[in-house]
């Protein structure tokens, strides 16, 4: 069980051991409830057909919300980044989840991400601005430059400001930093 917990992101050997020992001390019905919740989440949660965010419905709550601006599209690497931006309550547009970042060293090319769907979406919809909210790293910069080249013929492209430390992950940034990063976005040259 410890080995399984260690496979989770951000869980080291000591935390994995602590979690395993905690579960072993729980009543059997609580362990069954926990296991059932995991299995239910895995079988009931998929991806939104529009933005590729996690959703129990074919179209997620954000994409269905008529109060969200259809003219603004924020591109993120994964759902954790989307949730981090949502916590700021500063952004009222829609999203597109790539499913990762271009990383040739890890064997991840553009064709492995939701990039072709993004280009089709931007070309077909009335999107006035695409905001690239990608981690400030080599992979994030590479992906941003690649996307900017593809999307500029269709719409304005900006990137969130570099208020985030280089090499950091979006999901760990505090709400104020993310809010300022959104406010300070600029056009990609």
Curated annotation (Swiss-Prot):
Zinc finger regions, C4-type: 48-63
GO terms for biological process, alphabetical: DNA recombination; DNA repair
Gene3D superfamilies assigned to the protein according to its UniProt record, in alphabetical order: 3.40.1360.10, 6.10.250.240, RecR Domain 1 (1.10.8.420)
Signal sequence extent: none
Record-linked InterPro entries: DNA_Rcmb_RecR, Rcmb_RecR, Rcmb_RecR_Znf, TOPRIM_dom, TOPRIM_RecR
Alphabetical UniProt keywords: DNA damage, DNA recombination, DNA repair, Metal-binding, Zinc, Zinc-finger
Pfam families, per the entry: RecR_C, RecR_HhH, RecR_ZnF, Toprim_4
MF-aspect GO terms: DNA binding; zinc ion binding
Residue ranges of domain Toprim in the record: 71-165
Annotated SMART domains: TOPRIM
Protein biosynthesis recorded as keyword: no
Family statement drawn from the similarity comment of this UniProt entry: Belongs to the RecR family.
Stated role: May play a role in DNA repair. It seems to be involved in an RecBC-independent recombinational process of DNA repair. It may act with RecF and RecO.
The name this protein goes by in its record: Recombination protein RecR
Organism this protein belongs to: Synechococcus sp. (strain CC9311)
Gene name linked to the record: recR
């Amino acid at each position: 069980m410890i080995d399984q917990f260690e496979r989770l992101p951000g869980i080291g050997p000591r935390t994995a051991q602590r979690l395993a020992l905690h579960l072993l001390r729980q009543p059997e019905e609580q362990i069954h409830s926990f296991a059932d919740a995991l299995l239910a989440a895995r079988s009931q949660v998929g991806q939104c057909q529009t933005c590729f965010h996690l959703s129990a419905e074919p179209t997620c709550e954000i994409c269905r919300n008529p109060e969200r601006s259809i003219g603004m599209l924020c591109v993120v690497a994964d759902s954790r980044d989307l949730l981090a931006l949502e916590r700021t309550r500063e952004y009222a547009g829609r999203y597109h989840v790539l499913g990762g970042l271009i990383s040739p060293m890890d064997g991840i090319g553009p064709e492995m991400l939701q990039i072709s769907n993004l280009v089709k979406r931007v070309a077909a919809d009335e999107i006035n601005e695409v905001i690239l909210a990608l981690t400030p790293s080599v992979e994030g910069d590479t992906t941003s430059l690649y996307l900017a080249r593809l999307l500029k013929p269709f719409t304005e492209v900006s990137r969130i400001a570099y208020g985030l430390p280089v090499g950091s992950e979006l999901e760990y940034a505090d709400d104020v930093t993310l809010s300022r990063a959104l406010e300070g976005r600029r056009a990609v040259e």
